[in-house]
């Protein structure tokens, strides 16, 4: 059987560039080479695409490798090809892209739209699902509209903060009580997030958040268990066992997720059957109403005594490192890391086949 040519796309122009490299390293090592011909494609922080001998190592070390070269894909569905730019020549045909990109310019619908123009199938959600899930404010509005509980929040733009800090502070303190989380609206991996306990910390937290995004939000603190659920599928998604995170730090921040490895992961999470069912049902509903495909990880806060469940966020391209919850939850559910990647690739191909059924010609009959 002919191997599928899978381009693994990593790096990118977001604050989660390094997280993407860690995820890509794990994926490149786990893809089934009996089924797939793997083509690593890195994106430098300046946006340049590279391939060749060792693009991942170059991005990890910052040392240019003479065996790497600039590449691109053209928005021509008749030619699904990876091109070398200098000299301009064909490198390989591409059957599918696995966009291991986290955050802006990767997980927010931008790359997905480009790949749609190119006619190349890709793992994960499309433009709409990716962009809705990435924007925490829009995500919360839609989830709340569909009866899914989320924490109370106040959103604002960087320009508003720069024009009238006092008004923003007044509005936040009027609507929310300390402690408060301050977040960029369009970033993941806890980059730019602060937990603040007073006005001085609030100002510092907002100053940090606006460095990363033009839209931010302040969100009430929910003193519950941190629960995560992995979802896999297209029109009929299935769920993993839920897992609990017991953070080593005050909350599950960037260091806890990717560096110090001191946070405790409890899989499966010790929850009642009632809560497990509620978490699974809410996760699948969120996946559907946000128009997600392929995979997502849903994060929750759970108040056990009241049996209340709040959706914190949904990640359409969650971390894939060796300590990331998305693959860990599937491993504990009986699905190996390698088989998970294979399933994701075939789900992407199935979705592309469904999209290809759409007619692009119109004639009145």
UniProtKB/Swiss-Prot annotation:
Subcellular location per UniProt equals: Cytoplasm
Report the principal subcellular site: cytoplasm
Q: Which InterPro entries match?
A: ATP-grasp, ATP_grasp_subdomain_1, D-Ala_lig_Van_CS, D_ala_D_ala, Dala_Dala_lig_C, Dala_Dala_lig_N, PreATP-grasp_dom_sf
User: Quick one: which residues bind Mg(2+) 1?
Assistant: 299, 313
Report the record's Gene Ontology biological process terms: cell wall organization; peptidoglycan biosynthetic process; regulation of cell shape
Give the co-factor note: Binds 2 magnesium or manganese ions per subunit.
- Provide the protein name: D-alanine--D-alanine ligase
Identify the species of origin.
Natranaerobius thermophilus (strain ATCC BAA-1301 / DSM 18059 / JW/NM-WN-LF)
Gene that codes for this?
ddl
